[in-house]
Design a protein with these regions (language model features):
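Aromatic-residue-lined binding/catalytic grooves and analogous aromatic/hydrophobic interfacial grooves
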Residues: 2-380, 441, 483-559, 593, ...
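Non-catalytic carbohydrate-binding regions of carbohydrate-active enzymes
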Residues: 403-408, 413, 417-419, 423-435, ...
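Aromatic/His-enriched, Gly/Pro-containing loop or helix-boundary segments
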Residues: 57-58, 66, 314-318, 386-387, ...
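The feature captures the catalytic groove of carbohydrate-active enzymes
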Residues: 300-319, 366-416, 430-493
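Aromatic- and histidine-enriched alpha-helix N-cap/loop-to-helix transition segments
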Residues: 22, 279, 319-326, 336, ...
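Well-ordered alpha-helical scaffold segments within catalytic/enzyme domains
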Residues: 265-266, 287-289, 327-339, 396-411, ...
């Protein structure tokens, strides 16, 4: 089922900013359409296009965990910043834009720009007349612009980004806005003109080069961007792509493109009595496919779209593993798009040699651990070390592997991917843990992202609830994995038994650490990991219920002053954990109203100055879009310990409204379709993709199915009573 029309992106132009642009993407290329119609700008990004080079001085020789522990215990903030945070201020490594095109010769004046999510085709029109249609071919690094005959004379030009040559004076940047592209000393671009093609090839560093080309064929214009190890290869491949596109023709490319998207949208759908939540969900699913294509680089902070404002992207467009990557890839499984999300898991798996190298070089341990702020090769970028170099963030990456198994039921993946990844991570963490005076295991230093920023107070008394929840999750899940693979040993259980329980205050719930409670509003609910996303505490357990209620109530009491965009989706999840659909709906509406650009991009701060938080900047990051979609799904479907419940957090206002969804994925690959009519008739269909048994909470029965089998149920409210 295609997305409803109200989920399309409809804008009135001229569009003044790149972060409000019409976003096209295919997981290989990303393009942003913006500016005045007569000089339409098309920003072009290539997935995985990075300048990888590191400064000659590289990382300080004291860039080690042992040194970090020493400085933390001394309270030496200045030296900690010098060694561990300063590297992030260097301009490279960084994600970079590929360039932009300018389409000239179209009429002046205001216009209507529309992106049809169902087909991923954008159209620009004036007074009801379509002037331009454009799409990025799924499966090919090719964009197509289609003009009516009246605008055959329109022209396309290509410009490279405003990279510097290393001689210009540039302003100092910061982590949010790292400064001008002029900081990047790159050689001049090589012009490309051959067989009607125009563009350029750009050498980046010893491992990076790319070519951006376009060609006009009557009323159709094609463009491509290809990266390779060297300029010669990039140029050759780009020319081959354009020739192949021209040979196939725009209409055939469009037919293939539309078929791909029709199949994609057929994987899952939903119909809600709330257009805002529908829009959040469908747009997030569009952004997922537009930014994450099997065989290509996974989405960094900005997904498939790099900044096009002559500056480095916010936070360098890097991979933040202390929340951002995990939230970016949190909703895809329930949405039944495992292929798009597995891109990130394949990427993490490919980085295992780097993770082992970093564990040895930085932590001085066996096993594997990636830095929490890293470049595309898994190299440490630096940053606040309490979080950018926290070893427990690696466990959150482990959870992503287990979630893939949990929601697909793929036992081979469990054996060949999940178990080795968990075991290698545990080998690193086990060496870092030390036995305290009470016999409990603690880390040498502990923190809770991003509490107390990078001040001395950010080092909490070990173990913080953030670290502790993740450690419990790691060793407890390893026990489960061994049982699931038929090889229980008891080793991991013995380690978990030496971890202290979570620190709890009767008034405020989960604490930051054994001796500190959260006293002020804060964006990162890291102390509440045990509730969401680790789901270790269960609301049906009376003891857990009191902890969950106290924790969430305390966060509400402290207010949203220091929240950012992702905080609202996270709070929605915390409300869902206690079946508070009204609370979840409230937070998701606040997020949608105050933190989204008009094209659906999450801009992180209250950029409209509405008063919902104290941050009024607008750096674009995409993880909060996916987190909001995840919350929408959790309102509709709960799947834990093979117990399936539909509408576990239904808002009061939906009680007499139609609600439906199709093929949302539950545990062990069970696909759930559900419908409730306005007169409260319910229908539920479950389809197994793996053999298994599940308990259906709404019908109070177990169902046992073989792969491919389905079972349907109908009931009314009276029958339910």
């Amino acid at each position: 089922m295609l997305p409803p029309k109200h989920c399309n992106i409809n804008l009135t132009g001229p569009i003044p900013r790149w972060d409000e642009a019409i976003p096209l993407g295919n997981g290989i290329l990303g393009s942003l359409f913006w500016g005045p119609m007569e000089h339409l700008r098309i920003s072009v990004d290539i997935a995985g296009l990075w300048l990888r080079r590191r400064p000659e001085e590289k990382l300080d020789k004291e860039f080690t965990y042992a040194k970090l522990v020493e400085l933390a215990r001394k309270g030496d903030v200045a030296e900690t910043r010098r060694i561990f945070d300063t590297p992030y201020a260097r301009p490279t490594p960084t994600k970079i834009p590929a360039g932009h095109l300018f389409l000239d010769g179209l009429p002046r004046g205001s216009y209507q720009a529309s992106l049809d999510l169902g087909t991923a085709v954008t159209s620009f029109s004036q007074k009801g007349t379509t002037i331009l249609r454009a799409f990025l071919c799924m499966g090919r690094p090719v964009g197509v612009l289609m003009l009516p005959e009246a605008y055959r004379g329109a022209t396309l030009t290509v410009e490279r980004p405003s990279f510097g040559n290393g001689t210009q004076a540039t302003e100092a940047g910061n982590s949010v806005s790292p400064g001008s592209l002029q900081q990047l000393a790159l050689p001049d671009a090589i012009p490309e003109t051959e067989d009607g093609m125009i563009g350029f090839s750009q050498k980046g560093d010893d491992r990076t080069a790319y070519t951006l080309l376009c060609k006009k064929c009557g009323t159709t214009l094609y463009y491509t961007a290809v990266q390779a190890e060297n300029v010669e290869k990039a140029s050759r491949l780009a020319k081959l792509e354009l020739c192949a596109a021209e040979d196939m023709g725009a209409e055939k490319l469009l037919q293939q493109h539309k078929r791909w998207w029709q199949q994609y949208w057929g994987k899952s759908s939903l119909q809600l009595p709330d257009e805002t939540l529908e829009q959040l969900w469908y747009r997030a699913n569009y952004f997922l496919a537009a930014g994450s294509e099997p065989g290509n680089a996974p989405m960094p902070l900005q997904g498939g779209w790099c900044a096009d404002d002559d500056r480095l992207p916010p936070w360098k467009g890097d991979y933040h593993n202390d929340l951002n990557t995990q939230f970016t890839y949190c909703h895809y499984l329930t949405a039944n798009h495992p292929e798009q999300g597995k891109v990130f898991l394949d990427y993490l798996w490919s980085l295992r040699p780097q993770a082992a190298k970093f564990a040895r070089a930085f932590y001085g341990t066996a096993g594997e651990c990636l830095p929490s702020v890293m470049d595309i090769d898994g190299g440490a970028l630096g940053g606040w070390p309490m979080y950018s170099l926290s070893p427990t963030n690696q466990i959150w990456l482990c959870q992503m592997f287990y979630e893939y198994y949990r929601l697909t039921g793929d036992k081979e993946f469990l054996r060949t991917r999940v178990e080795p990844y968990f075991t290698a991570t545990a080998a690193c963490l086990e060496e870092l843990l030390q036995e305290g005076p009470d016999g409990k295991l603690v880390l040498p230093v502990s923190s809770s992202p991003e509490i107390h920023d990078d001040e001395a107070a950010s080092w909490l008394t070990p173990n913080s609830n953030y670290d502790l929840a993740l450690l419990h999750y790691l060793f407890h899940t390893l026990v489960q994995i061994e049982y699931q693979l038929g090889n229980p040993r008891g080793y991991w259980h013995a380690i978990e038994s030496k971890l202290a329980p979570l620190s709890v205050d009767t008034e405020t719930g989960l604490m930051l650490s054994p001796d500190e409670t959260l006293q002020e509003t804060h964006r990162h609910f890291s102390h509440a990991m045990a509730i969401e996303p680790l789901c270790m505490l269960r609301y049906e357990n009376p003891q857990d219920r009191s902890v969950i209620d106290a924790t969430v109530d305390h966060l509400v009491h402290l207010g949203s002053g220091q929240w950012v965009g992702f905080s609202f989706g996270w709070m929605a999840l915390l409300q869902i954990a206690r079946s508070n659909g009204n609370g979840a709906l409230y937070e998701l509406h606040r997020f949608a109203e105050h933190f989204l650009s008009r094209n659906g991009f999450h801009l992180n701060g209250d950029y409209k100055n509405s008063g919902v938080c104290d941050f009024h900047y607008r750096p674009f990051t995409l993880e909060a879009d996916f987190l909001a979609a995840h919350a929408v799904q959790k309102m509709l479907l709960r799947s834990e310990k093979n117990h399936i419940e539909v509408l576990p957090a239904c808002p009061q206002g939906w009680k007499n409204e139609p609600v439906a969804f199709q093929n949302l994925r539950a545990e062990n690959g069970l696909l759930i379709s559900y419908q409730r009519t306005a007169d409260s008739k319910h229908s539920l269909t479950v389809k197994a993709t793996q053999d298994g048994s599940w308990y259906l909470c709404n019908t109070h029965c177990w169902v046992t199915l073989q792969a491919g089998q389905t079972q349907s149920y109908q009931w009314t409210e009276e029958e339910k009573k």
